[in-house]
Amino acid sequence: MIGPVAQATSRIRVGSGGVMLPHYSPLKVAENFSMLSALFPGRIDLGIGRAPGTSAQIAFALQRDRRQASPDDFREQMDELLEYFGKGLRELRFQSPEVSLLGSSPQSAVWAAELGLPYVFADFIQPGGPAIAAYYREHFRPSVALSEPRVSVAVWALAAETDQEALRISASARMMLLSLFRGRLIPVPSVEKALAFLSHENAPIDTLPAGRRIITGSPERVRESLEAVAAEYGAGEVFVVNIVHDPSERLRCYELIANAFRLTTSHTSSI
């Protein structure tokens, strides 16, 4: 979707959040994102992650060599990828996207700091990352790509016209998370199905697995909460993640958050 979205817009940055590098050849990733960067200069971001990001079956299907377990060589893959975007292979003349390292563990912060890359912490996977973000800042090594540490945070956030309506439509995400923690990966359920599930489980509508958080509420409440999370991490950018069953409600959620932060453009300006 990066190409079509970039083609349909002219101002916003578009990117991956992210490419799970262990599933792919670094050269192939470099080729794909170099082409996108050549087509849309200065607008393409490449977020790189290490997690499987999918079920065991799909991870196996993506495996580079199914005859043996995939090696744990993520750092070597990152070095190779950055080499293509850095000195690179002269004959290929790669265009470079902006590369960030995504993570939810202390090790990801170590790598981001060592490589001198922007760091995006997945609070929606593993809350409690401010200490990890602080480690990244303290140990950051300036690079050609980045002279100072830069932290972003990705967080669950869901806005609706009222606090109660936001809480209601968040039931789909809560059912998915509870099912995932029990080892079941399910499609996004309807709000009605999710509410019935929570009722059957005798779980409050605002229930979540221990340690997880979903920001819900009116646009103003969500804005205040997102600003608080950004301050907690010292983040200059916030990635909003949500799971909503109805596509129109999901779009409205993003519109409400954008309006709360006054991110909307005038009718005459391009996106």
Task: Place the predicted regions along the sequence by residue.
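Conserved, mostly hydrophobic/aromatic
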Residues: V5, L36, A112, A166, ...
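The substrate-binding groove and active-site-proximal loops of carbohydrate-active enzymes
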Residues: S16-H23, I215-T216
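An alpha-helical appendage that flanks or caps ligand/catalytic pockets
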Residues: F60, R66-Y84, G88, G129-A235, ...
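N-terminal beta1-alpha1-beta2 module of alpha/beta enzyme domains
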Residues: M1-I12, S270
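Acidic-and-aromatic substrate-binding clefts and catalytic sites of carbohydrate-active enzymes
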Residues: L21-L27, I125-I132, A159, D246-S248
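Hydrophobic faces of well-ordered beta-strands that scaffold small-molecule active sites
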Residues: V14-S16, I44-I48, P97-L102, L117-A122, ...
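Flexible, glycine-rich active-site loops centered on histidine and acidic residues
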Residues: P22-G86, P127
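A conserved active-site cap/scaffold subdomain adjacent to cofactor or substrate pockets
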Residues: Q107-A109, A113-I125
